[in-house]
């Protein structure tokens, strides 16, 4: 047993007697008493912390994390249990942790350890980086996983990389609008260039104008900070052909709604409107660090949607890089505009399979709440591949329709299409708008409006950015693209 401030053990609700036999004496009878009284039942995500009286263990505390019924444990449960245990250690101010690995559910060893490491990494995060008082809970600094599983180091490294990449996205999403604007987002995402296999290019306003990206430029014209676009490419060593996975992420660094101004209540949350951009750059970073065998690129169109004197107005008409003209009937339907130009450009750069990620519509929250990400796409095998990737990663996505009947709402009297079809079916019509610019070939849209942010703290997740769908995209890039 390594010297540690805390020993973390998982306790299934249907194996309480075994846990008491193994750890009852080491906890000075504390675990035995807690189980006997019903104070600790092994319910999923329950935590009980006891002083350790076994001097030969060199451990200060034993942290018991309830895992629920052993047969009910899935990928998301493991990640949550790991985060709950890590948060408990941080609250205990126990930076050195020894973690006892144990079989859970039907997950194989590598998957379980991968998720364990990711959950710990996600919990070892604090969004209060502008606090000046010493109120932050100490981070975990030394973690030893006690396991006999083969190739454990590989699985633990993979999970740590995924978790740390998701945390990088969470940092950007949590940033206030006065600290993060398009140029700053380019600088932050530009650090991808330090990752082996990734090259980065930043397109400024003049280059965007040369490319005819009237929608992106139009959205940002009311801001003092002009639009930019990040283009990052990952090429695996020795790979010269095959499909190219294109990841496109919405990068509205702050969204007031523009002239179609949002209500003041809740507008502060609109700093998270670049969550899609943060997500795709985090995913690309992870694919490169894990040496995924697929060529990939990440494109982030970045703009600030402000109601300045030069701002886009309802009734204006913009010309897209794809050549389509768009009548603006709602300046708060801006994300689809910048994504449209970016999707077109991704195809020009050779993307064969596209996924865009965006905090796109409140309508998706109405449809699916804040638990499930909305999924749209075509053809069906591509949608199924993304659903399978989400399932492997323990994330929830749900497909919504793209019936042509909904297109009537996008008709314009003076342009090719309008940018908003109104409230009914709003998530669907927004996705249909994007489809106009996605070209031929597989395309999917992930609407993370409800899942990008945790409004209420959970035992496994503090309030703030969540890092949603990073793992889904990473899983997608590690399997053959259909």
Model-derived regions: residue spans:
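Short amphipathic alpha-helical segment within the helicase RecA-like ATPase core
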Residues: 1-244, 248-251
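A generic structural signal for tightly packed, nonpolar segments enriched in small/aliphatic residues
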Residues: 41, 186-482
